[in-house]
């Protein structure tokens, strides 16, 4: 994941942009916005405040291919304020919506894909 500032940052996905054909199975005309359940989201933010744990809340990118051959493929999402990239949240939110259930994706940043590390 990246776009958040540091490894170990906690990101709560309010919504999930999707680069995948996964949503097509639901046969919705247009593009459904996969969103977290508001009550779960607000409870998680309140719990983080009580624990003194800083969190960032916002849009995340759910993509089939975490690593690609296109080095600039995520630039648009970064410019649009996407906080992190992962592979499951979009499907989680869509499946929950279809099943009439509630869902929330809480992420911990595990790496920063675009930071170069000097090998010397």
Predicted feature residues:
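Glycine-rich phosphate- or other oxyanion-binding loops that anchor nucleotides, phosphorylated ligands
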Residues: 1-120
